[in-house]
A protein has these predicted regions:
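Amphipathic alpha-helical packing segments from all-alpha helical-bundle domains
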Residues: 96-100, 120, 145
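Alpha-helical structural segments
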Residues: 24, 28-29, 47, 51, ...
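A ubiquitous short alpha-helical element
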Residues: 44-50, 64-72, 89-93, 134-141
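Short linear motifs at protein or domain termini
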Residues: 1-65, 69, 178, 182-195
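C-terminal all-alpha effector/ligand-binding and dimerization domain
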Residues: 61, 80-87, 92, 104, ...
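Amphipathic alpha-helical effector-binding/dimerization core
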Residues: 100-103, 112-119
Length: 195
């Protein structure tokens, strides 16, 4: 449990930016508000992870289906541009660039869906919990190839305007990411128990 004043003092900033950060972290489920301006740091357990990815899967599969119906030629060009960049990143083994392409590609699909509310909610969720920020580069490289392959299939289906199959492929992609995160967390827990 920490207080707003303690954190502001440690960071040598006013309370305002810390309060705003706390509010965002409370909204995202990382902190819980206590009495007397105190907050409790919540652990990220399996339920939190599953809830996060299930919500993302529901929204992202809808975006994939909507993108099949609403995507313009400009949207397709943007997705192809990002995909080409991700292909080059994978060939070079550049996980930093691939990570950015991963986000950019998902965002391009959300944009092609044409629903501003979904874009906002998914952007907020993406910034809250991302597998690649919690694992090493080597570990991410192992799952990046699978992610890349899934992206190729999702794009193929969106370009073919096959809404039903694109929706299914996106849901599988997101839930596979969930399983990766749960496996990683389980492994981390086992490592800490051995030490």
């Amino acid at each position: 449990i920490v207080t707003l004043d303690e954190i502001a003092s440690q960071l040598e900033v006013s309370n305002t930016p810390v309060r705003e950060a706390f509010q965002q972290l409370i909204y995202e489920g990382f902190l819980a508000q206590q009495r007397n301006r105190r907050v409790e740091v919540l652990s990220i357990g399996p339920k939190f992870i599953r809830d996060h990815f299930e919500a993302r899967a529901i929204m992202e599969k809808s975006c994939a289906a909507l993108a099949c119906k609403r995507a313009t030629e400009e949207d397709f060009k943007e997705m192809k541009r990002i995909n080409e960049k991700s292909i080059k990143a994978m060939q070079k083994g550049d996980m930093t660039v691939y990570t950015r392409c991963n986000y950019d590609l998902h965002h391009a699909i959300w944009t092609a869906a044409g629903n501003d509310k979904l874009i906002k909610m998914l952007s907020d969720m993406w910034n809250g919990l991302a597998v690649e920020r919690l694992i090493t580069v080597e570990e991410y490289a192992q799952i990046a190839q699978l992610s890349f392959d899934e992206h190729q299939e999702i794009l193929r289906l969106i370009f073919a305007r096959d809404a039903k199959q694109a929706e299914t492929a996106m849901e599988c992609h997101i839930m596979r990411s969930c399983e990766n995160m749960l496996e990683y967390q389980k492994g981390q827990k086992q490592k800490s128990e051995q030490n």
